[in-house]
């Protein structure tokens, strides 16, 4: 499973809200020897794959051309809408 991601340039609550209104959501990739990286993902692409078991095993994220193997560590969902608010990924 592979997803395209873009490094986030803006941080904070306002920037995250603008992402969500644009059909994206913020995420972070951490672990290993590299520094944590804030990214943005397209909500529609991810939410359609989340009900598959292989989503929680290993994912390839293409972050600005570099491929990183990750595993979802934490998912924050909206209280009553079927939306993802934020995700944490750990490098494997």
Curated annotation (Swiss-Prot):
Q: Does the keyword Zinc apply?
A: no
The alphabetized UniProt keywords are:
Ribonucleoprotein, Ribosomal protein, RNA-binding, rRNA-binding
Q: Which residues form the signal peptide?
A: none
| Pfam families, per database record | Ribosomal_L25p
Q: Which GO terms describe its cellular component?
A: cytosolic large ribosomal subunit
rRNA-binding keyword on record? yes
Question: Which Gene Ontology biological process is one annotated for this entry?
Answer: translation
Stored SUPFAM superfamilies? Ribosomal protein L25-like
| Self-association state and partner proteins as the record states | Part of the 50S ribosomal subunit; part of the 5S rRNA/L5/L18/L25 subcomplex. Contacts the 5S rRNA. Binds to the 5S rRNA independently of L5 and L18.
Q: Which family does it belong to?
A: Belongs to the bacterial ribosomal protein bL25 family.
Q: What does this protein do?
A: This is one of the proteins that binds to the 5S RNA in the ribosome where it forms part of the central protuberance.
Instruction: Show the NCBIfam families listed in the entry.
Output: PRK05943.1
Q: What is this protein called?
A: Large ribosomal subunit protein bL25
What species was this sequence derived from? Aliivibrio salmonicida (strain LFI1238) (Vibrio salmonicida (strain LFI1238))
